[in-house]
Amino acid sequence: MNDNKATGWKIPLLFCGVVLAIVCIVSVFRGGKAAPPAVPAPLLRQAEAITIDLDADAEGKAWKARIASAASGFSAPQNKDANLDKIILTSLEKKRFDASCTAAVLIRDDSLRDALLARILETASTECASLPWGVLAAHGMRDPNAQSAAHARLTREWGKCHEGKE
């Protein structure tokens, strides 16, 4: 009788255990990204209350159609991003923050998206009433440094808007 049992399972099991241990150790010691500074709570509540509904009026429906046309089709992502870029700049001129925020989240290039969201923030920061749109723009940014700078600006602008009121 032959007692050759299958013993080849020990080495792969040990290998998996070592890999799992390394992954766990790295995840524990890896520094997480710092959370951006918080925006003032009343401003955040105003931003959370915003509902984007481009179907609410005829002009919004036209913006929605332009955005859908620019973001779809068989063209290269760079071309789609360029078309969305034009739509965002045009909608910002007309102070249609709903259209500009909708188009901005569809941009695939992270650096372009962050730059355009910063532009939305800049335009929204010119008036106290449009400041909540800046919060939406800041939350759409992917770069943590840009997001921190945006939150700091929002806090500053909110303070200017409410200086003598509190």
Where do the protein language model's features map onto the residues?
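Non-catalytic tandem-repeat scaffold regions and their flanking low-complexity/translocation tails
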Residues: 10-166
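Short, low-complexity patches enriched in S/T/P/G
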Residues: 2-12
